[in-house]
């Protein structure tokens, strides 16, 4: 369908019977309306032509050959005269044969039939709206019992037919013949309701706004009751509250989409265009047909049998009519979802029929295999590898992919900057990989996001936007924190890269799809960007340090004060491996690491700001060392306090490793960057 903004889109949902008929009906010049499929036949066995009013009828679905009717007459398509657009003899319209790919038909059902997706789906929409157990609704739909109509003012004779044997077993001998009498049809229409027709009546009587109001009142009452202390009662109350919320959401959705609840019960069954369920003739008189054709045949046969019984209702036993209604319901269920009744339906060769649900869903379904799995322009694909130096919103693109994706933009800028005179010369410069090409490419990429997608796209985080950067090699670099949203890992997974072209697409990518703006799970609200697997192992190795006991601190010489500047060029005097060095700042520690004087896990003492948490701590020192000048050192498990003779704290040193320092600096820079970004936005 095409919306008001002329965007092509596909929408799956409920439609009214009038809309189904409008999709299929065509009015012939003689006033006859065609579109209803009434016969289960396909092609005539002698002429190999489609049967009239059958599943491949040319009057309903259009001609097999463009501009040629069933009689063999031809006329150019698009004639202005309405009478000349149709064959006067066979009624086939002179149009292109491609109409058989989208022209639909319909089957007029002799009895209402529930849509199995809305009855047996999880959750069951019909059961939610009616606030009734699913098992009871299934028993009603499949004729296991009936219920009395509440609208009648006369005394009802029948309550639950399925309970006759238990409640009034003594009357069985007199009740059973009653269902075979000619007057039962009148009695049935007046007093009892059964099958999908009963469901349709109840859905039609619903007032969705009253449902929302009543459900809200009941939810508030349950909320006010609080917890009773009984675990079973509290659990039932929680389940009921969740059900009420779902019921209100469902009713609100029906109101917003202008959908009537009774449309979940079918009176007209749409018939797919014949080109979507073809019959193929092979050599040796072999015929290969779609399973959907066989399922449609079953529906039409059972529906015709039911219509015949209803016409002869005075002679047909009621049990036979109700049994035939159940068969029609089961045939439609098999057409829509073959496994809805437990075991899937099989043909004579013990082969499982593929229903409409089987054709649509799954990896080999119509959407994922035929529509979503196609190559598109301005896209590429490669294996992903970890990019630890990237920011969360960045991805690394190989040079080959980047120059292919942004080739037109590079050519435009080459011509605009007068580096070339025409497109052919610009392409040659790109082919020869001149330096100016890479400069322009980086400039173009700086302001243009790309989209990364990993199949299968099961939720919206399966495709996110990134700022591209050029990397060497032939793989796409990705920040490890965004892998959880894609459900990806670095064991050979492939990802596709797409280039948004229009300004609207680029704005949407920047405002809604950037990875640093999708930090929470849309389903449950938990953080989606959390370190996992190799990141946790790396952080553990970075911060574990050498587990030297406190004895190493007690008997370590603390004469190596930061007052004595460390001479990095002299490795003999100040830096012996049996001592834990002191540093006045983290920059000094990093400098020593770069000169390979210390390692990442080597314990060291780092001068720290006067922290009130450390000063006010009640921890007892392990040892106190006094010097001749009156100064002292209080040695604790993880820090050291230096004081003067006046008992004033002069400095504090913490015992740490370079790994801890690096990790702390990274977190500090990230927090500061976030604070600056937040201050800019506010």
Curated annotation (Swiss-Prot):
Cofactors: Mg(2+); Zn(2+)
Residues given in the record as Zn(2+) binding sites: 69, 71, 87, 90
SUPFAM superfamilies named among the record's database cross-references: beta and beta-prime subunits of DNA dependent RNA-polymerase (SSF64484)
Pfam families, alphabetized: RNA_pol_Rpb1_1, RNA_pol_Rpb1_2
Subcellular location: Plastid, Chloroplast
Single GO MF annotation: DNA-directed RNA polymerase activity
Role description: DNA-dependent RNA polymerase catalyzes the transcription of DNA into RNA using the four ribonucleoside triphosphates as substrates.
Official protein name in the record: DNA-directed RNA polymerase subunit beta'
Protein's organism: Hordeum vulgare
